Amino acid sequence: ELYENCMSCKYPSPPIFDYIVQVEPLKVQGDTLGERIEKIEAMSESEKLSYFKEQMNKCIRCYACRQACPMCYCETCFVDINSPKWLSKEVTNEDNTIWNITRIYHLAGRCVECGACSRACPEGLDLMYLIGKMNRDTKRLFGFEAGLKIGTKGNLETFNPNDPDFFWKGES
């Protein structure tokens, strides 16, 4: 049995492989991640905020998503640092929001949408939507999609002091 995200994968044949067995391509079944994102993007701002808060209220900060994610590979995660202390040990909506937003930004341009985070979550958070939305914005803004070419760095993994966008220099 295939995972749900495999049934709606936009790349059912891997773009990178050593050897591949030719099989009939999978037919997309059910809502794709893009369709789920579009449904939520169509919501009003207050509906989106309500949806996001509902998702954050589910989180128990067990970090199963982090442990399951092949792209979470920092030697020391910011949540495990005691000085400075980024998050309290209490499970609050505010700290859950900080945790999830920070994780989403860390995965921007790296997530390959394998779904390991959503499968690992004991509370059923729609983590694939939240990270998938960031991936969609990354592709739209930077023209970058993770996992398609070997040796390329993600859009947020590089720094160029000659970047034409002056936001980081404080100029306009």
Q: Which residues are covered by each model-predicted region?
A:
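A conserved mid-domain beta-alpha-beta active-site/ligand-binding segment of alpha/beta enzyme cores
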Residues: 1-26
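Short gly/pro-enriched beta-turn/loop segments at secondary-structure junctions
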Residues: 4, 52-54, 60-64
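Short Cys/His-rich metal-coordination motifs, predominantly Zn2+-binding knuckles/fingers
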Residues: 9, 62, 114
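Secreted/extracellular small peptides and ectodomain modules produced from precursors
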Residues: 4-7, 63, 75, 119
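Ferredoxin-type iron-sulfur electron-transfer modules in oxidoreductases and energy-metabolism complexes
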Residues: 26-57, 71-172
